[in-house]
């Protein structure tokens, strides 16, 4: 069996990396950091492709020598925005954690044990914080099962019931200019979740790198809350309850959040992270590709194992020309909001699938609903916290797991996989466990996480 030379360990391969690095570098520079000057965009130099690496089976007598020279894969979790539809993502997380326990033989296994980076937007950001926040720097506070239950139990505190009556939120905004605010209820729910005694947990109180976006009205640009940045300086460390409130501060449902870092040096006026990036998968991938301090041996997307959780399209709506040609502004508001959100998430999915190219099926899994046969969802399914809507979403979440997985094809739209979402999650859990086990055999560490300084009381 061939082994990697030192140069191969450090340099990306030309097969997938030049395309993927360029795509993600441009996306990161232009959209995450607002760079418009092409001179500031980082484009990698073309390099020679290394020899292909043989697949190593766990039972192979030569497995250990081969495994110890492998770079390993960085495991990434991404969770979309989606309001109350986030219950679907929570159901997928709960199933994944159950599969991890089964395949690892560890009844205490948690999602955070097996992922190296997590990104979440809006409700996905809340779930990310829940899964990776810790009070003892050892164990996550919440289980995966508790994510969707938290949303089901606290939905009325986050999304006011009155905002979804009489025609929906956008109609009320257009007609009255306001829907009221659920800020107080949301703030209380977030504080209860992310405190340790009298101390508010911050971004530093997470077990692994997390990325949670919001949109900063003061700079009119996306702002990304990052554990890595928080560990560098207190000027980028924020209380987790405020981060969660900021990323889920949907205009019209709750007021904007005036964010201030723990040292008071950084401020932003934050609203819903879903406005900045409804699908944060690209943010997570670019973070890994550009973070050589914590991920020193990553060459490109073939060194990543990515799970992206979305909610899919539950409203099967199509529009005919004769129907829309006479629409006025108020008629376009809600369809445009839905098209923008769904289109953005799908565009990211297509971009990621394009970057992974041939290793798409082995390195990237996207889980989301493909419609529902359980009855028609209401037009405000994403903001309706009523028991009936929660019950419906719980059932759709279970249905989603049994549905055939939907894959994005490069320049080919989407296709229905032969495997169900449940089977995809089972396979992915197996890959996570295998990667976790192999790391103890490798010469060099796959990851080298920054560690927070000891807390001073």
Go through each PLM region and give its residues.
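Conserved catalytic cores and adjacent C-terminal regulatory segments
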Residues: 2-457
């Amino acid at each position: 069996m061939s082994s990697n030379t030192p140069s191969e360990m450090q340099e990306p391969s030309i097969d997938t990396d030049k395309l993927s690095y360029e795509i993600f570098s441009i996306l990161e520079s232009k959209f995450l950091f607002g760079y418009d000057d092409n001179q500031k965009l980082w484009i990698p130099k073309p390099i020679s492709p290394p020899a292909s690496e043989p697949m190593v089976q766990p039972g192979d007598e030569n497995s250990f020598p081969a495994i110890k020279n492998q770079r390993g894969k960085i495991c990434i979790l991404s969770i979309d925005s989606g309001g109350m539809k986030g219950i679907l993502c929570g159901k997928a997380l709960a199933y994944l954690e159950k599969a991890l326990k089964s395949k690892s033989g560890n009844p205490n296994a948690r999602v955070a044990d097996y992922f190296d980076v997590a990104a979440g937007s809006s409700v996905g950001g809340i779930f990310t914080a829940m899964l990776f926040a810790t009070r003892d720097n050892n164990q996550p506070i919440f289980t995966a099962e508790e994510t969707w239950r938290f949303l089901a139990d606290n939905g009325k505190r986050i999304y006011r019931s009155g905002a979804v009556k009489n025609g929906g939120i956008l109609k009320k905004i257009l007609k009255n200019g306001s829907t009221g605010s659920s800020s107080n209820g949301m703030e209380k729910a977030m504080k209860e979740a992310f405190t340790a005694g009298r101390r508010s947990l911050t971004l530093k109180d997470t077990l692994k790198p997390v990325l949670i976006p919001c949109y900063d009205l003061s700079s009119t640009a996306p702002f990304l809350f990052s554990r890595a940045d928080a560990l560098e300086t207190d000027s980028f460390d924020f209380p987790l309850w405020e981060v969660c409130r900021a990323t889920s501060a949907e205009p019209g449902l709750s007021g904007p959040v005036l964010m201030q870092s723990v040292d008071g040096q950084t401020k932003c006026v934050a609203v819903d992270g879903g406005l900045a990036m409804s699908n944060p998968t690209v943010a997570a991938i670019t973070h890994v590709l550009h973070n050589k301090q914590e991920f020193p041996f990553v060459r490109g997307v073939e060194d990543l194992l990515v799970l992206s959780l979305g909610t899919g399209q539950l409203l099967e709506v199509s529009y005919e020309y004769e129907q829309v040609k006479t629409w006025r502004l108020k008629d376009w508001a809600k369809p445009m909001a839905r098209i923008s959100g769904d289109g953005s998430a799908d565009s990211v999915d297509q971009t990621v699938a394009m970057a992974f190219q041939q290793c798409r099926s082995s390195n990237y899994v996207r889980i989301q609903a493909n419609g529902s046969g359980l009855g028609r969802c209401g037009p405000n399914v994403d903001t309706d916290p009523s028991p009936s809507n929660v019950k419906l979403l719980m059932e759709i979440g279970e249905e989603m797991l049994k549905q055939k997985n939907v894959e994005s094809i490069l320049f080919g739209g989407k296709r229905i996989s032969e495997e169900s979402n449940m089977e995809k999650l089972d396979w992915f859990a197996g890959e996570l466990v295998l990667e976790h086990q192999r790391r103890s055999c490798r010469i060099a560490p796959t990851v080298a996480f920054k560690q927070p300084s000891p807390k001073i009381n």
